[in-house]
């Protein structure tokens, strides 16, 4: 919904979100702006959400559920921009090689389906 209003958060780490009764409240909004890079928001969230797990099935589930949810109201072109940019590469230092490859492969595969 935020992206549909042409806003980006700029700092979409899961730790900057509070979940309560099926609603999400965002904190740490000093990087929020209008008409920013939505692909950055998507990439940052996916990478940080995957960072702390070594259970690769859970990582796959997190990524796929996020993409499913995003596509309910978001624009699939934003996912294509993520695939066609170097955004995911920025997060390589904080991820294992396997985690990075899982993220990259899932996002690329999901984009090809559109």
For the regions a protein language model found, what residue spans apply to each?
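Conserved protein kinase catalytic/activation segment
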Residues: 16-26
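Generic detector of solvent-exposed, compositionally biased contiguous segments
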Residues: 7, 24-31
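Catalytic-loop of the protein kinase fold
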Residues: 4-14
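C-lobe/activation-segment region of protein kinase-like
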Residues: 29-113
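An alpha-helical support segment within catalytic cores of ATP-dependent transferases
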Residues: 1-6, 99
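Conserved residues at the C-terminal ends of beta-strands
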Residues: 13, 20, 48
């Amino acid at each position: 919904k935020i992206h549909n209003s042409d806003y980006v958060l700029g700092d979409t780490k899961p730790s900057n979100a509070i979940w309560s009764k099926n609603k999400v409240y965002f904190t740490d909004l000093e990087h929020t702006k209008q008409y920013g890079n939505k692909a950055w928001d998507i990439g940052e969230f996916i990478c940080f959400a995957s960072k702390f797990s070594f259970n690769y099935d859970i990582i796959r589930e997190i990524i796929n559920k996020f993409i499913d949810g995003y596509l309910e109201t978001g624009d699939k072109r934003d996912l294509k921009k993520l695939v066609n940019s170097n955004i995911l590469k920025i997060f390589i230092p904080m991820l294992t090689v396997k985690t990075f490859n899982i993220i990259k492969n899932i996002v690329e595969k999901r984009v090809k389906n559109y």
